[in-house]
Amino acid sequence: MRKGSKVIKIKYEEDSIFVGAAWGRKRTRWGRKGARLTLEAISDYLKKGAGVHSEEAYLDEVKCDLLRLIRKRLYQQALKDGKEIKEYECSFEGVVIWPGKNKFICFNFGDGAVLGKTDQGHIGSLLLSEKRIRKPPQLTMDGAVSDVGLKRGVWSTYHELYILEGRQERWAMSVSEDKIEEGENPLLLSIKAC
């Protein structure tokens, strides 16, 4: 398995669209497998989690439930493979859109960001990684829930959402004057409103 390999998952359901990206940590041998399992866990949770897009659902509880499910999947895989759970460490980010309800939730953990472009053309941050992460947060360590970013939004507010990878100082150079610069930049995915 290549270290640090990216996994992108796009899943259309009857009432929702899931778009996520994850990548294994550079020093983890099974990070790509962990990234795939993590995106599956997030997709399954948000699909089954009826009402997570509503204002009545507490985001801190959603974070805890989500992290618990991710850890469970990684732990089961580690047992199956005879490995340590930390070998499956990864960073992830993405968005789930419920077009019929005009709602979305974006999520991230570790490096990366989710940005939104309004109908007026302004690009603003929805979720950001910390500006200078000294040591990336670990899914399998105590306190990880505080590093999981979740944010709700109204889908019609945005013309386009962007999922970017890497540390903030890397991708911040690519966003200027309300546009994503061409060339070498960390843009992974762009989701346009229809």
Predicted features, each with a name:
Residues 1-194:
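PP2C/PPM-type serine/threonine phosphatase catalytic domain
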